[in-house]
Amino acid sequence: MRAFLALTPPERLVDALSTLVSGLKCGRHVDDDDMHLTLTFFPDVSLAELEELNLTLEMIRTGPVPLHVTGVATFGSAEPRSLHTVVAPDPALVHLQKKVETAARRSGIDLPHRRFVPHITLARFPNRMPPEDHAKIGRFLEAQGDFQFDPVMVDEVVLIQSTLSSDGARYDLLETYPIA
């Protein structure tokens, strides 16, 4: 199965991000309930591996971590794939990410080697977009690229299963781990 460990932003941040992205008139916007900051992604994980990981995650107590949104950007320059918030790589956030990644590897989970880029995805774009959608994204970034939101604290990590479909991914909460 596909799954990931993430932080779920507090409702007041989700509300602000939802209002922000409503100004973008293209792409497939992420539902409010699906907004998250991925700590580590498991492209193919077994239930046995998740059970092993569960034991370790129940013991992680790093304390709450701040999410500080410092801007809006895209992944993919010539052909943007997604629009996301830029989240400051606070030392507490980076420490938590390294701890959960290490816990996953020690549980036998084979993880892709990716650099941690803290972000919250707001919208996804098709592989090919008409020029007018490129222009809309450009205008949106010009107007909103410096969007900021005061740091908010998150005190739990969530384990989410991701099921792909033609309508995009469906997320199902599997477990919650308090970190405070």
Show where each model-derived region lies.
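Histidine-dependent nucleotide/RNA phosphoesterase domain, centered on the 2H-phosphoesterase fold
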Residues: 1-180
